[in-house]
């Protein structure tokens, strides 16, 4: 699974908040993916803070130590990452952060859909190019 299958488009709003469009649409899979990556998150509609105490709503919140949080907000089609980039306080860049989430999301979504279609997960192998090779088996 290569994270390059996801295309990100950044939209700058009038405030300091940046919305980054994703192809993430299944909330439970996003939440599982964040947990798999040991990223602490909170659920339910809450407000995140940005520059000068500006606020923005999000359904999934990742708290940052600097009190300027990261959120995932449903836009009617998919979840957008919403944050004030001026206060980004993660160990990785925004792109690397999203690539990690996207890759884990794809892995979890494939596993979920495959199971629904009577496939059984056998193993996953990390490849040298950073992708993940999944082995699934059809069971009767």
Language-model segments: which ranges?
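Short, Lys/Arg-enriched N-terminal segments with co-localized hydrophobic residues
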Residues: 1-13
């Amino acid at each position: 699974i290569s994270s390059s299958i996801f295309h990100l488009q950044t939209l700058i709003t009038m405030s300091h908040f940046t919305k980054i469009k994703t192809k993430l649409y299944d909330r439970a899979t996003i939440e599982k993916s964040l947990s798999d990556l040991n990223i602490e998150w909170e659920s339910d509609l809450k407000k995140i803070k940005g520059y000068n105490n500006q606020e923005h709503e999000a359904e999934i919140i990742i708290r940052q130590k600097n009190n300027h949080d990261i959120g995932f907000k449903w836009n009617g089609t998919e979840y957008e990452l919403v944050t004030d980039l001026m206060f980004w306080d993660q160990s990785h860049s925004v792109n690397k952060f999203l690539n990690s989430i996207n890759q884990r999301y794809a892995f979890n979504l494939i596993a979920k859909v495959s199971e629904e279609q009577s496939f059984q997960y056998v193993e996953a192998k990390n490849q040298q190019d950073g992708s993940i090779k999944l082995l699934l088996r059809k069971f009767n």
